[in-house]
C-alpha cells in the first residue's frame, strides 16, 4: 500500500519547502523506495500558465503538457523522475471539477459544501497520484503557510487522509522558520511554537519539525521546540542555509531524517546509496575551471522566472568541473545600452523564452552581438524566434522582418502564428504544450550534441518559424538542424559560419538533471569555456 508524507509550512513562505520536499524524495529514492511528489497550490487560478512571472516565477512544463509550479522542476531534478499534470493541483482545479459534477447532477441534488465535497475532491486527486504511479511513497507539499485561509480545505483533507488510509500509512512534516533578531542576537522559537499550535488546531500533529534558519540551531533550542511539539529531540531537525540547494539531502541525511522516516512508516528500505550525490556536491564545491555566461531576459529582477535555465547551465558546468557564473542582463536596458558594455565580459549568451514585445529588441541586439562576435549562443523558444528575426534583418538585409506576435501587420513575418492557434480565444492551457519528437539533421551541432537522430522535447509556444522564408534563410547560412517528423515545424536552428550558435523552439531546460545535464546546455558551456582558451 502507498504511504503518504504531507509537508506543511509555517511562519513564512519561501523558506525552501519545495527544496526540502525534493530532498526527502531523494533520501527515499536513495534507499530503493519508489517516490512521486505532488504540490497542492491554494491559489484559485486553474494553473500558473497565465500568471505573471513577477508573481509566480517560472512556469514548469511537464511531459504531458501541464503548466505547473516551478517546484515541480525541483522535484524532477532531485528524484530524477518525469511528473505529470496530476502532480500539481490548485484550488481552481478542485472547484472547477466539483462545479462541473454538480452541473451534471452527480450529487443528486445535494447541497455542495467544502466538507465533504471539496475535501473529497482533494483527497481523490492525492490518491490518483498513487494509483497512476504505484509509488511506494507519495510526498505531498501543501503550498502557503499554516493559517492562510486559502489552505484550510487542503489541511482538512490531509487530516482526513490519516483516517482514510490508516495512521501508520501517513506522516506529517512541518517546515518552519526560526527568525534571527539582530537586536537580541538570537534565533527565536516563539513563531514556530505558534505555527505548531495552529497546525494542531486543525487536527494535525507533526511527526517531524524541520527548522529553517540562517544560523546554526543548538541542541537546547531543538529540545525546547521538541518539548512544545511533544516530539523526541531527534524529530526536530535543524536545516540551516547552505551554499547549494543540492547539499540539502546530505544535511537531512546526516541529521538522521531518512532513517526516521523509514522507521515511522515501516518501509522496506535498502542500504542508503548517496555516493553519486556526494560526488555531485563535491564537484559543485571544488570546480577546476570557471566561465561566465549571460542570461538576457526581461524578468531578470526575479530570477525564479528563469529557474530551470539557470539550473541547467549549472548542471552543464558541474558535469565538466566548471563553475558557470551567470550574469543577469536586462533586455530592456540592452535596447539602449552599448552591447559591449553589458556583454563584453561574458563567454556565452543565452536568450530564454518569454511573451510580449517588451524587451524583445534588446534580446535581438544580444543575438546580433553573439552572431557578429562569434560568441557561443543558445536561444530558447522566444530566443530562437529572436535569432530568426535578427538573421533576417541583418544577414539578409530585411529590416522589416518581425514576428506577428509583435507586429501583426509586418511585411516580413519570419515568425508567425501556428495555423491551429488562429481560432483560439482562451489563453490558458491552449498553446502547443508538452513533449513532441524532433528529427535531427545529420552533421549538425544539434545532432552532435544529442548523439542520435531523434529528440523528445517539451514545448510551450503559439508561434513558429515561417517556412515561406526557409530557402532564403538557408541560402544565407541559416541551418535548420531539427524539425518535426512531418518536416513542417522548425524545431532547431543554427548558423553555418559560427563556432557554436544553436537555438531551439522547445525548452531543453525542463529536461536537465544535476547528474545528467541536457546535451545542448553541456555543449554550450563547453563552447563558452573554449572562448577563454582562445
UniProtKB/Swiss-Prot annotation:
EC id: 6.3.4.2
Single GO term (MF): ATP binding
Binding-site list for ATP: 14-19, 71
Activity control note: Allosterically activated by GTP, when glutamine is the substrate; GTP has no effect on the reaction when ammonia is the substrate. The allosteric effector GTP functions by stabilizing the protein conformation that binds the tetrahedral intermediate(s) formed during glutamine hydrolysis. Inhibited by the product CTP, via allosteric rather than competitive inhibition.
Keyword annotations: ATP-binding, Glutamine amidotransferase, Ligase, Magnesium, Metal-binding, Nucleotide-binding, Pyrimidine biosynthesis
Residues bound to CTP: 13, 148-150, 188-193, 224
Active-site positions on this chain: 381 (nucleophile), 507, 509
The keyword ATP-binding belongs to this UniProt entry's keyword annotation: yes
PANTHER family (alphabetical): CTP SYNTHASE, CTP SYNTHASE-RELATED
Subunit-structure text: Homotetramer.
Name recorded for this polypeptide: CTP synthase
